Amino acid sequence: MNYKVLVTDEIDPEGVALLVAEPRISVDEVPTLPKEDLLNRIAEYDAIVGRSATRISADVLEKARKLKVVGRAGVGVDNIAIDTATSLGVAVINAPAGNTIAVVELFFGAVISLLRHIPRADTSMHAGRWDRSALLGSELKGRTLGIVGLGRIGSEVATRARAFGMNVIAYDPYIAPSRFEAVRVQKMESLESVLEQSNILTLHTPLTDETTGMIGKREIARLPQHALVVNMARGGIVDEKALLDALKSKHLFGAVIDAYEKEPLAPDHPLRSMPNVLLTPHIGASTMEAQRNVAVDVCIAVRDALLSGELSRSINVADVGGQWSDIEPALTLARRAAGVGRAILATQGMRVVQRVDVRSGSALTGAKSALLASAARGLLEGTVEQERLNLINARTVAENRGIDLSTTETPTQDNPFSIEVRLSGGMQEIAVAGTAQPGVPPRLTRIGAFHVDVQPRDTLLILTNNDVPGVIGRVGTLLGEAGVNIAEYHQARLAQGGQALAAVSVDGDVSEAIRESLLRLPDVSSAAVVCFNPG
């Protein structure tokens, strides 16, 4: 399959070259497009890669019927309609690590510049003055730096701040305590406790409903007298009016701002007239190295998502809890086990599954959410009118259909790579289990009460029959005469002479006519056909 990618917003050529080098990918590189032009063109592309200048709005996504991936060369994704992308099954991929050092270095450069009055000193020197006595500054050493958001950038700021002899405290309710210990930062239990102790407050969080306006009038009032506020994250985290009032009243010593509520900043914005504010035009990531890094990172991720389906870098897909290559067999197994269960229930007359429960071994604990999404996808494939049903939107689609999704802890299982998918509705239930070790094709090990050992590949026949001589031979003969090649045939029984189950892996498709012929064989009581989609 070949793919078309639209690249815009002047992405670094080193990243674009990685896409161009792939024979299955064709690239159209264009300047930033007006929205109307983007709407007219987007339908023909499988992916778009850009920066913040291009807004990927809900109407753009709805027009993009082929779109699989949106790549953002940078960190912030507030220019992308994430909820719409998720509902449509479009992966959103950013490059959070590529510009880390650029932002960190700008932070220290700007803060030191303000504390040492470097902009004023430079201006006065160029004006022919020698204002040495009026430029008495202050040092970083001994000050308390409060960090809100201890992710990549916050952690790197903390490491370098300690080298300056600063006392570093931080607040981030989503980061494990071990991370605070690793970067040798004092963990604060509330935003208020950080505010009350910070001589310099710096923000390194995404812009979300939770963080919008997070630093307002009340929060600024909690800061010590003559504190410094730094926002190099996203505009809107700091209430600009409240900041301006605190600067005018001299409650704050100053501020360093690189991100604004509305960009570009209006020429007459009152912040521009404040002498104790250092303003930069959102240049946190504006280094040659950072632009190259984020372009390379996002283009690699977009390429891998298109060519191999790897979604580990997607911000709107469930966390896989490890390396994608290690977890991929488990995702495949969960999806295909659900498909097998659905097919068996259909032969029993049940068309509506009400509940999906996934149980997994200890090695897959971190991937539970992704496994559940994959099982939901396997259940729904072929039964819903959804052009892009995948890990990204399968849970939402299932929940919208009233299907209850859950995971169950199974800490005592002997096999750490085991997975069981249990489907139920009304009085009926089926459990399909298997094992999925890294680097090894997954195998089904149990279907209902029957223990089997078969690889779920291409097409799987599940037959129930009486445990009597001749059934296997008749099934094999019928399939052979129909031109269907058997890859594996596993027969299981609960007791001699009772009911048996056959799991037959075959190459290619099995038509409805062949299935009906199987049902007409003596002693065969049911026949289900599961065709596994690639991926």
Predicted regions and their residues:
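N-terminal glycine-/charge-rich "phosphate-binding" loop or analogous flexible N-terminal tail
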Residues: M1-Y45
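Phosphate-binding beta-alpha-beta segment of Rossmann-like dinucleotide-binding domains, i.e.
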Residues: L88, P96-T144, R152, E156-F164, ...
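NAD(P)-dependent dehydrogenase/reductase Rossmann-like domain
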Residues: S286, A290-G535
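Phosphate/diphosphate ligand-binding glycine-rich loop within oxidoreductases
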Residues: D28, P34, D46-D122, G137, ...
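Rossmann-like adenosine-cofactor binding region
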Residues: T54-L61, P173-P270
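Conserved N-terminal Rossmann-fold NAD(P)-binding element of oxidoreductases
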Residues: T8, I147-V148
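Rossmann-like dinucleotide-binding domain for NAD(H)/NADP(H)
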Residues: L88, V92-I93, E189, H226-A346, ...
